[in-house]
């Protein structure tokens, strides 16, 4: 009986630990600071690359084009995030071991398989009709050339993950005390918000944004909370995208 009690307490302790960790990260931050991060998240997604610079960029190597555009995407939100969170950087940034890298790849693979199964069920039993990501329509050669740029862009996306999570947790904790309720609600709202930021990318298919984008986003935020390391969230995200690229390459050949 004592063993059963201990096993039942583990999930509760995990929720409590995650909740306490999030409290430590956001308790010294004002709503204005976190709102600034959210506004930068929205601007990062919806402010396109300056058209007047394209005539210069289009004349350079395509690999460098992707890298420059990725830097334009990631640098502003990353800079503002570090500016606001600098005093607590040691709480969310740690070195990654090789064992943790393997865990991130294996977890990304499991998430990818689950999402494939979920998508197949969704298509089979509903009228759901997905919209492909424009990147997937560029051919495998361009996809491989884009990989360095994608790696840089995912830094910005990872910053967006945690920024949105911090924002929602700060709000939720102002009126919800229960660790389980607060951290669960924060994760669901954060994943949904990040998914809905992709509405224009997926032709305003909100179901696809909430499921195909939102669910993996929640998994990546959980990964961040489990390891208390923003880099682990990034590696899970990077490996997830890498698996998608490799799978598309295998299927196309």
What are these regions (language model features)?
Residues 28-86, 136:
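Alpha-helical transmembrane segments in multi-pass membrane proteins
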Residues 143-253:
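Transmembrane helix-loop-helix hairpins at the membrane interface
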Residues 48-49, 81-91, 168-173, 225-227:
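Structural signal for the C-terminal ends of transmembrane alpha-helices
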Residues 23-40, 68-78, 102-121, 219, ...:
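Alpha-helical transmembrane segments of integral membrane proteins, especially early/N-terminal helices
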Residues 30-34, 65-73, 100, 104, ...:
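Residue-level signature of transmembrane alpha-helical entry/exit and packing/kink sites
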Residues 1-32, 90-93:
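N-terminal juxtamembrane cytosolic/stromal segments of multi-pass membrane proteins
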